[in-house]
Amino acid sequence: MLLNGIVAAVITMIITIIGIPRFIMFFHKKKLGGQPTLEDVKQHASKAGTPTMGGFVFVVVSLVVSLVAALVFGKFSPAFITAWWVFAMYAVIGFLDDFLKVFKQINEGLTAKQKMLAQILIGIVSYFIYSHGEKSHIIHILSWQVNIGIFFSIFIIIWLVGWSNAVNLTDGIDGLASITVAISLTAYAVIAVVHQQYDVLLIILSVIGGLLGFFVFNHKPAKIFMGDVGSLALGGFLAIVSILLHAEWTLLLIGAVYVIETLSVMLQVAYFKKTGGKRIFRMTPIHHHFELGGFSGKAVGWSEWKIDIVFWLFTAVLSVIALCIYFAF
């Protein structure tokens, strides 16, 4: 039931709000370095030393609360297990990456190859867990249903890897990723309620609760960042939720911000290589472009709050449009 999910969300939010300050104190007590700041963005100088890995708190709390709730309310289904597994495993990848950077002072963290291999393995296991409860290999595009058979396994891997990294790129300024993802997940919560998929709804609402609790400390000026442990987990979670709700295509609208952020990086890199050093944007991902003045020529651009609000509203509007189209077909 919806009420069960709301209760789980509130509990997750409260525990996260209680847990984050203690996590911040741990970082300060151990004198651990925070997330590296961007030298080209002068506004970020004040962020030096800010603790990271805050995603560890809301991820763990969301996982524990949703698991207990699923067992208590009888929602421990293959769909729930799949969503839970993906969220947890992508968090593990992010945690290892953050751990190497923060605790072992290895700036690169996990190598790109290590991350990719881990994400592919998680995608393969996710496919088998998903297939245990869902026998069809159908991708839903508006009113069309395309059966891609064995290639569905490849689709799941690409979908998970793509969206996890897209959300990771979006997590670049205070509060941006946490609320943008919360808005995206709210759209999927609506779909889950309408289709009475309360097993998936339970974990969706738990994660939203965790994000709201985290935002209390992550808004400008942020006292803590979520790190890869949070952003990679959220991206993978969004991807698998869209699959479990048979609404894969909607993520292209609901997650348009993540798509734009990713495309800005890809275009910048390609153009830079082709022109021998020229740039399309002042800096990517594109939220930094707006911070640095955008195409206006000004030395200082939008504030972090302005970027946040514009991106949140953009996500909210496109989410409503996606839902309208989804239910129309």
Swiss-Prot record:
PROSITE patterns assigned to the protein according to its UniProt record, in alphabetical order? MRAY_2 (PS01348)
The listed locations are:
Cell membrane
Matches recorded under Pfam families: Glycos_transf_4, MraY_sig1
Its EC number is 2.7.8.13
Q: What is its main location?
A: membrane
The reply on keyword Metal-binding is yes
GO terms for MF: metal ion binding; phospho-N-acetylmuramoyl-pentapeptide-transferase activity
Bilayer topology reads: Multi-pass membrane protein
* NCBIfam families per record: mraY
Instruction: Return the protein name.
Output: Phospho-N-acetylmuramoyl-pentapeptide-transferase
- What's the source species' lineage? Bacteria, Bacillati, Bacillota, Bacilli, Lactobacillales
Q: Which gene encodes it?
A: mraY
